[in-house]
């Protein structure tokens, strides 16, 4: 199961997930000016971020929207970034947040678990219902793939639906979590966690989610730039594992803390990952 690989990476390298939500504005001007086109510049930037953080981070999350917005050339860049990480032996999460009926979901599964856009994990939105997961299950069982389902997200608007009260004094996200936990038991790895994980933002208190979802591995966004605190992020883990804590802008733009020109941006990114790990261990 792919979840066993991710669990082992967390054990060996720590729980940090590096987000490659790479916007052109994030590139140091001196670095950008070395290239004749934006796509080559961003790919080179991504390469150097990956190379500098590879031995100190568990995995990488690539937000597809940043690449889709650049059109066909952006999707070629997306493909090259995914391939670069996977050929190095890294684990990549494609942050695509798809969610649709089974016929369409089958095509999404094929698109993102095979071919040009193949990744190890993808993010999905389960709020159309759990039947939308059916086309992905063969990939979990037989092709070393996994998903993270949106459960309780880090944005302020998550309260509009996810936090609604139900008759049994639970909230919508609690019920969705129960379904994720139950479905996930069919795809448990040797590590005790399922290849069906959940997205839980650390901009809100943990509130027993970790205890209730014992077999669900967490993708934890919201740390740093979105306001999530280290002590809250760490509370979603179990003995330092059971989840990955994502940081994107905090790592990609770490150079701005020390060197506005960004001559050593990859070294700054590496140091940010290391400091993040130290902070999480201390608390």
UniProtKB/Swiss-Prot annotation:
Keywords: Decarboxylase, Lyase, Pyrimidine biosynthesis. GO terms for molecular function: orotidine-5'-phosphate decarboxylase activity. It comes from the Bacteria. Its EC number is 4.1.1.23. One of its GO terms (biological process) is 'de novo' UMP biosynthetic process. It catalyses: orotidine 5'-phosphate + H(+) = UMP + CO2. Pathway: Pyrimidine metabolism; UMP biosynthesis via de novo pathway; UMP from orotate: step 2/2. The active site is at 97 (proton donor). Signal peptide: none annotated. CDD domains: OMP_decarboxylase_like. SUPFAM superfamilies: Ribulose-phoshate binding barrel. InterPro entries: Aldolase_TIM, OMPdecase_type-2, OMPdeCOase_dom, RibuloseP-bd_barrel. The keyword Lyase applies. Belongs to the OMP decarboxylase family. Type 2 subfamily. NCBIfam families: pyrF_sub2. This is Orotidine 5'-phosphate decarboxylase. The lineage of its organism: Bacteria, Bacillati, Bacillota, Clostridia, Eubacteriales. The gene is pyrF.
């Amino acid at each position: 199961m792919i979840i066993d690989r991710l669990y082992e990476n967390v054990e060996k390298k720590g729980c940090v997930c590096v987000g490659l939500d790479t916007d052109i504005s994030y590139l140091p001007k001196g670095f950008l000016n070395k290239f004749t086109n934006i796509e080559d510049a961003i790919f080179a930037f991504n390469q150097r971020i990956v190379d500098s953080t590879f031995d100190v981070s568990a995995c990488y999350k690539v937000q597809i929207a940043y690449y889709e917005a650049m059109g066909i050339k952006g999707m070629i860049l997306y493909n090259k970034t995914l391939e670069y990480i996977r050929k190095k032996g890294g684990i990549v999460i494609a942050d695509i947040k798809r969610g649709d009926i089974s016929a369409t979901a089958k095509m999404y599964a094929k698109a993102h678990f095979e071919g040009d856009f193949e990744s190890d994990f993808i993010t999905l939105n389960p709020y159309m219902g759990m039947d939308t997961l059916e086309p992905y299950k063969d990939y979990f069982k037989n092709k070393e793939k996994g998903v993270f389902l949106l459960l309780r997200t880090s944005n302020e608007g998550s309260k509009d639906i996810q936090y609604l009260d139900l008759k049994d004094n639970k909230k919508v996200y609690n019920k969705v979590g129960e379904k994720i936990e139950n479905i996930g038991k069919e795809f448990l790895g040797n590590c005790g966690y399922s290849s069906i994980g959940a997205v839980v933002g650390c901009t809100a208190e943990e509130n027993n989610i970790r205890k209730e979802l014992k077999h669900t591995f967490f993708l934890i966004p919201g740390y740093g730039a979105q306001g999530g605190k280290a002590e809250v992020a760490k509370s979603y883990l179990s003995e330092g594992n059971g989840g990955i804590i994502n940081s994107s802008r905090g790592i990609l733009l770490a150079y701005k803390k020390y060197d506005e020109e960004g001559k050593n941006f990859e070294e700054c990114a590496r140091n940010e990952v290391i400091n993040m790990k130290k902070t999480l261990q201390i608390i």
